[in-house]
Swiss-Prot record:
Residue ranges occupied by any PBS-linker domain in the UniProt entry: 11-191
InterPro entries: PBS_linker_dom, PBS_linker_sf, Phycobilisome
Membrane topology: Peripheral membrane protein
Keyword entries, A-Z: Antenna complex, Chloroplast, Membrane, Photosynthesis, Phycobilisome, Plastid, Thylakoid
Tagged with keyword Chloroplast: yes
Subunit structure of this chain's protein: The phycobilisome is a hemidiscoidal structure that is composed of two distinct substructures: a core complex and a number of rods radiating from the core.
Keyword tRNA processing found: no
GO biological process: photosynthesis
Annotated localization: Plastid, Chloroplast; Plastid, Chloroplast thylakoid membrane
Biological classification of the source: Eukaryota, Rhodophyta, Bangiophyceae, Bangiales, Bangiaceae
Protein role: Rod-core linker protein required for attachment of phycocyanin to allophycocyanin in cores of phycobilisomes.
Record's protein name: Phycobilisome rod-core linker polypeptide cpcG
Gene designation: cpcG
Amino acid sequence: MSIPLLKYSLSTQNQRVDGYEVSPGEEQPRAYNTDNLPSAVEMDEVIWAAYRQIFSEHQILSSTSDSNLESQLRFNQIRIKDFIRGLILSESFRKLNYDVNNNYRFVEICVQRILGRDVYNEREKLAWSVVIASKGLESFVNMLLDSDEYEENFGDSIVPYQRRRIIAQRSKGEMPFNLKTPRYGADFKEKFGMPQFIWQGPVRQFRPQEQRPKAGDPALFLGMVNDLALFK
C-alpha cells in the first residue's frame, strides 16, 4: 500500500500573488513556448532555455545533451512537457543532482526547476521525500509534472521558469535558483572534502606587495604564531 502525499501548509511567495502589470518590463522572464510553430533558430532557443532551467547553466555539458529528445521535439513528436520529463529522468540529471544530494535537497531542486517556485516549508520537503522513498524517482517527477500547479502555469508547451522573481513593488528581485541552490549541499561538501575555508582564507587575506609587513614588523611574529597554532 503506497503512502499518500502528506499535507503541508502554504506560505507567502511572490508567485502566489496575481500580477496586474499592463505592460511587463524587460526584467520579466521570457516565456519560451512552441505554440506558434517556432523556426529552427527559435527552436534552438527553446531547447537551450529548457536545458538552462533543468540543468542550470553550470551543469550544461556535452554529456547532458540528449539528441534523441531534441529531435523528437523539433519534429513535434513530443511536447515541451515531455521534453522536460525526459531531461529530469535522464541518467545525467540523476548523477549530477540525485546521487550527490539527500532526498530533501533533491526535492527542493526539483520543485524550483519544475514548478518555478521555492518550497513552501520543511513539511513540503518531507511530503515529497516520502514519495521518492515509497514510489521512486519517476513517480515523484510525474506527480510534479502532472500536477494542477504545473498545468495552470506552464501547460504542455511552455518551458518552466522562476515565476515572479521580480515584482514592481520591490527594488530588488529574489535570488535566482541556480545561485540559491548550488549543486552540492553543505553535508556533501564536507563528505567530499571540500570545506570552503581551504581557499577562502588566502583570498581574503591577500595584500598587495607594497602593503606587506617588512622584516621586524610585529605582524610577522603574530602570523608565525597563528601558523603554529594550526598544526597543534
